[in-house]
Amino acid sequence: MIFDFLFPNRCLDCNQLIDKNEIICEICKDNIHFSNHQFSEINSLKEKVSLLFPVENAFSLMLYEKESLAQKIIQQLKYNHREKIGKNLAEWTIEKLSFEDKKPDLIATVPLHPKKLKQRGYNQLHIF
């Protein structure tokens, strides 16, 4: 409780005070470019992944653009060991995905190189 008073939780983007379980405020969350792939038959991610191997569908939570809030969020997770971010990303993914009848056979992540694992000391995707 004293820790929360001395070090209140702030939005990663605008620095506004936010709930201790959040990573960004609602205003900044509205500014994130979430993808709208939702396992649609035609999407740009599916086209890119299909160049590497055959897939029926593909999904990404956010559009990762240089200098974007999505980039800031991912970098905080990867390099600053902010576990709360992984939990928030998992919650956002659940909110955004509606599997309906098409549950995925596989959820794949980008593998972490052993050298990076040694440098960071953890794999950020294990938090997610």
Residues covered by each model-derived region:
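Glycine-rich phosphate/pyrophosphate-handling loop used in enzymes and phosphotransfer proteins
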Residues: 1-128
